Amino acid sequence: MFRTCTKIGTVPKVLVNQKGLIDGLRRVTTDATTSRANPAHVPEEHDKPFPVKLDDSVFEGYKIDVPSTEIEVTKGELLGLYEKMVTIRRLELACDALYKAKKIRGFCHLSIGQEAVAAGIEGAITLDDSIITSYRCHGFAYTRGLSIRSIIGELMGRQCGASKGKGGSMHIFAKNFYGGNGIVGAQIPLGAGIGFAQKYLEKPTTTFALYGDGASNQGQAFEAFNMAKLWGLPVIFACENNKYGMGTSAERSSAMTEFYKRGQYIPGLLVNGMDVLAVLQASKFAKKYTVENSQPLLMEFVTYRYGGHSMSDPGTTYRSREEVQKVRAARDPIEGLKKHIMEWGVANANELKNIEKRIRGMVDEEVRIAEESPFPDPIEESLFSDVYVAGTEPAYARGRNSLEYHQYK
């Protein structure tokens, strides 16, 4: 009965043309340098907006009109986005070095190459909006307002860490940032729950529930989509499609790889996740749509991770080194924005070099402070403290060890 089936293991080739378009699957570009602006229209003032034209192929919609490709930005916004992305990359490179020096143990998932997604989303929302994501969370933790030392300290298990050194890489939290989640796809229904709370409290805010292409096949994703549509929740389900779920390409694991269409009855938006300006514009559009209509939206950011799935994965057994080098050389999100900044006269190479030098020094100093922070006290009580944010603890708790049969305060 299976004679007519395609042989297991054969998948269509994914071809990338010179413009960065993925042939045969989708029309969105992954080029980070397609935006256009006239340098003559760029004002001297850092807070005065000027027009930028995004490429027509940075968006693709499903049951929804795509955002306008005519946007306005300021010098200050562009430099702020550049600083955010450079800081995230320096943070992740520091994590890489500390892990290899065995100062970070356990799980550690880096987002080098995906910086435009975190920076662009944060630039489009406020700190009153919420974000929940997967274990690849360091960049989002930083954009949500955590210090570098609190992130690095958490990874090294130090008291200065965001979770007092007891959560590790996958369990980092801040106000309106709900992690870092260690279970694949677990954050998707939790994101729907945050959206429910926002609607119940009548807040004009939205939630970004981010997950990867690998997690998109989890059953709980579809359950969350259904409830969000049924109840009209202001949630943006955002898939960071970095092409590989652990070591399996999307084409080998998913019968349908257009993840922005997975909601069926929920509109979707495909976005060039390597272009921070496209991410910024799409995220502004998504927030406006979900808040004003009290409805969910699916998004897919087409991006790429340079490293392996985690620090224990070299990332070269299921893809070639040439593939990674080609993307890094041609479509790097930081280099793409850097090119625009210089071409449009926002800043020159020397000014950008000074920014990079300042960020490198800041990250190095934060790492030094984190390394000097002590470990949690090696006593039994430490295992059961810092479960809740100070001031939010329940009046009573029980069952923290086998001898506690009664409630206690």
Curated annotation (Swiss-Prot):
The name this protein goes by in its record: Pyruvate dehydrogenase E1 component subunit alpha, mitochondrial
Modified residue annotations for Phosphothreonine: T6
UniProt source species: Schizosaccharomyces pombe (strain 972 / ATCC 24843) (Fission yeast)
Function: The pyruvate dehydrogenase complex catalyzes the overall conversion of pyruvate to acetyl-CoA and CO(2). It contains multiple copies of three enzymatic components: pyruvate dehydrogenase (E1), dihydrolipoamide acetyltransferase (E2) and lipoamide dehydrogenase (E3).
Residue positions, PTM Phosphoserine: S310, S312
Classification of source organism: Eukaryota, Fungi, Dikarya, Ascomycota, Taphrinomycotina
UniProt EC number: 1.2.4.1
Cellular-component GO terms for this entry: mitochondrial matrix; mitochondrion; pyruvate dehydrogenase complex
Amino-acid positions noted as binding Mg(2+) in the UniProt annotation, renumbered to this chain: D213, N242, Y244
Keywords: Magnesium, Metal-binding, Mitochondrion, Oxidoreductase, Phosphoprotein, Pyruvate, Thiamine pyrophosphate, Transit peptide
Location within or outside the cell: Mitochondrion matrix
InterPro entries: DH_E1, PDH_E1_Alpha_Subunit, Pyrv_DH_E1_asu_subgrp-y, THDP-binding
